[in-house]
């Protein structure tokens, strides 16, 4: 039997869901312009790196910690994690891009669901106490729907992999079949990533690959662009 709570959460993974993810490459466009990423194989290598670094030690670990804080009704911990996610995201474009996507996701979630936590998170932004991050909002929504944290992380990783793959299909370019082949190959890697996220200590929050951050910073100066970040 289909779990409708899971389907409701999966709605937010749809590539047509208007969070603005289609406008952000999170540094991928810099790699493409330098011809470091130029085909199916090189893009998948980049995607695995992004998954195993930024989506693991920033978004993914934060989601696990936020879920625990929600269960403990620890608002201070959630605001601290929101702040850490914002300030440790050094490249300006990716920092602002995440904030923009978080704002859109929170507003859409508020329209669709009457969640005390999401309404509270939105209010914290209005009071300038939170920046709003999509990873935190997604976790709050999954928690509201009664979905376990492992599944919430699975869906969030899938949403990012799917969105970035569609952006690569446009930018490299790749064929749609190649894009689906990449997503198919990434599914077992996503499971490994989620399993790793569930074991790493909170002290490792924010670890990332310098090369990713440098290329995200340098995207500000690319001559021709189709993405905001």
Curated annotation (Swiss-Prot):
Keyword Cytoplasm: yes
HAMAP family, alphabetized: UreF
Disulphide bridges: none
Keyword Signal: no
Top-level division of the source organism's lineage: Bacteria
Protein name in UniProt: Urease accessory protein UreF
GO MF terms, alphabetically ordered: nickel cation binding
Subcellular location: Cytoplasm
Function (record text): Required for maturation of urease via the functional incorporation of the urease nickel metallocenter.
The entry's keywords: Chaperone, Cytoplasm, Nickel insertion
GO cellular component labels: cytoplasm
Subunit structure: UreD, UreF and UreG form a complex that acts as a GTP-hydrolysis-dependent molecular chaperone, activating the urease apoprotein by helping to assemble the nickel containing metallocenter of UreC. The UreE protein probably delivers the nickel.
Family classification: Belongs to the UreF family.
């Amino acid at each position: 039997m289909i779990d409708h709570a899971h389907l409701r959460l999966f709605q937010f993974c749809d590539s047509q869901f208007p969070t603005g993810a289609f406008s952000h490459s999170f540094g991928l466009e810099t790699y493409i312009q330098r011809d470091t990423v130029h085909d199916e194989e090189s893009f998948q290598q980049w995607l695995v790196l992004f998954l195993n670094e930024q989506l693991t030690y920033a978004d993914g670990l934060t989601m696990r910690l936020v879920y625990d804080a929600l269960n403990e009704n620890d608002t201070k911990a959630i605001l601290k994690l929101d702040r850490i996610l914002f300030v440790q995201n050094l490249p300006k474009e990716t920092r602002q891009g995440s904030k923009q996507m978080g704002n859109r996701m929170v507003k859409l979630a508020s329209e669709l669901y009457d969640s005390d936590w999401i309404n509270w998170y939105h209010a914290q932004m209005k009071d300038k106490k939170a920046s709003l991050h999509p990873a935190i909002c997604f976790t709050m929504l999954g928690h509201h729907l009664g979905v376990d944290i492992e599944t919430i992380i699975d869906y969030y990783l899938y949403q990012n992999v799917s969105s970035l793959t569609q952006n690569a299909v446009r930018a490299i370019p790749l064929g749609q079949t190649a894009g689906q082949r990449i997503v198919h190959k990434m599914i077992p890697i996503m499971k490994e990533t989620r399993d790793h996220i569930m074991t790493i200590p909170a002290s490792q929050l924010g670890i990332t690959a310098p090369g990713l951050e440098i290329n995200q910073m340098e995207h500000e100066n690319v001559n021709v662009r189709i993405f905001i970040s």
